[in-house]
Amino acid sequence: MKAPERDWLDVGLEPHTLHTLWAIRAAVALAHGVPVSTITGRDLDRTATRPRVAFYVAAIKARKWSLTQIGRAAGGRDHSTVKKCADRAMKRARTRA
């Protein structure tokens, strides 16, 4: 019997266990099976955007950093990009549940 597919936003992170954006970024990359450069890169395919958005969501949930700081750690993205992507992802996750 096949194991249930895990939601791509859930990377198994406890916010209190990760103390830096770089640790969150590395953990998300590991959970998604991609290199960190995929999260910081400019690719727009699903294999790059899903881990990137999961990083945004995990970093926002930790509540330690501003959207600008999160965007910089994600390869120089603007704070509005971080907010828009994370809001969309969290809204989709709520409607699926």
Where are these regions (language model features)?
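Short, Lys/Arg-enriched N-terminal segment that forms or immediately precedes the first helix
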Residues: 31-45
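Short, solvent-exposed alpha-helical "recognition" segments
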Residues: 84-97
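Small/polar glycine-rich anion-binding or flexible loop at a beta-alpha turn
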Residues: 42-47, 72-75
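General nucleic-acid-binding
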Residues: 1-27
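Short, amphipathic alpha-helical "recognition" segments used to contact nucleic acids or chromatin
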Residues: 48-65
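Residue-level preference for well-ordered alpha-helical positions
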Residues: 29, 60, 71-72
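Conserved catalytic core of nucleotide polymerization and phosphodiester-bond processing enzymes
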Residues: 13, 34, 67
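Short, basic interhelical loop/turn and adjoining N-cap
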Residues: 66-68, 72-85
